[in-house]
Amino acid sequence: MVCFASLFEDVIMHHCPLCHNPESLHYFEDKRREYLQCAQCELVFVNPEQRLDAKAEKAHYDLHENDPNDAGYRTFLSRVADPILERIEPDSTGIDFGCGPGPTLSLMLQEQGHNMSLYDLYYHPNTEVLDRTYDFMTATEVIEHLYHPDQIWQQWLNLVKPGGWIGLMTKMVIDVEAFAKWHYKNDPTHVVFFSRNTFKYLAERDQLKLEFIGNDVILLRKAQ
């Protein structure tokens, strides 16, 4: 049964940026932003009028310091790397989408014998890699930043061969009480928030096998 912040809130006519459903409900509001929830896929998203522009968004990303030699960072990324490695064939091809200024997950997978390509809107904007298909794709701490998750989701599906894997890492919405205290929403570049039900909706719609690993890793497999 779908649970929203309040069954008595007025429906707001903001199209969901993921499934395009025209009906959303007020979910939460703080001093900086209003958050809405789609009545169909349950995506929680920031009011589009309150998102950063591209210049401010990149300035925030430039503050990130991800060192490929940082053992702690590698341990963090191993939460998605290890289950992907368990499921793919030797010498597979993959793409790390949204790899950031210090690609690390791709290096970890290359070290295990796989052939990796990189793409990032700001730091590795080589769009030629988006014209190929791969055995697997990874996107760690990426999906929550997407202004157009509908378009990028379809792009991800197109990047992966039949039977291929998509490995994602993102924190997921639990309920509005937890959301109110959630530090994850406070990052100004975090604009869409998925729940398990959102991923279940997408998996059913797009005929994907879905697995949750722990609290923040999502694996999806395309049909053969």
Residue ranges and their predicted role:
Residues 177-181, 185-196:
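Alpha-helical subdomain
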Residues 115, 165, 209:
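Residue-level detector of anion-binding/catalytic polar loops
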Residues 141, 145:
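A short His-aromatic
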Residues 146-156, 170:
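A short, conserved alpha-helix within the catalytic core of class I
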Residues 1-136, 140, 153, 169, ...:
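Conserved N-terminal segment of class I S-adenosyl-L-methionine
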Residues 89, 147, 161:
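Short conserved AdoMet
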Residues 163-171:
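Conserved beta-strand signature within the Rossmann-like core of class I S-adenosyl-L-methionine
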Residues 125, 174-176:
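Feature marks short, surface-exposed loop/turn motifs that line or immediately flank catalytic pockets
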